[in-house]
Amino acid sequence: MPTYAVTYHYTATPEHLAEVRPIHRAWLAERLAEGTLLASGPMVDTPTSLLIWRADSLKQVAETLDNDPFDIAGCIGERVIQEWNPIFGPWS
């Protein structure tokens, strides 16, 4: 199954992000439990985050991410989805 790297670029205020973050993290925990989300977390000192997904297609990742509470709440200004080919490590 292909692996995808997703970058979120946030445009929401820190206060709005903090308000939505608990339901966003609960949603991510559900994706982790089902095995589609492999890892996620914020980048340091920049309003971006990286998420690693397993899915059958880029379209499937995009459709899943459309249901992310951060996306629904308008926190994400840009979302970049790229197929990733991990050569080394636990996901290769």
Regions found by a protein language model. Give the residues of each.
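Conserved, structured core segments of small domains
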Residues: 1-92
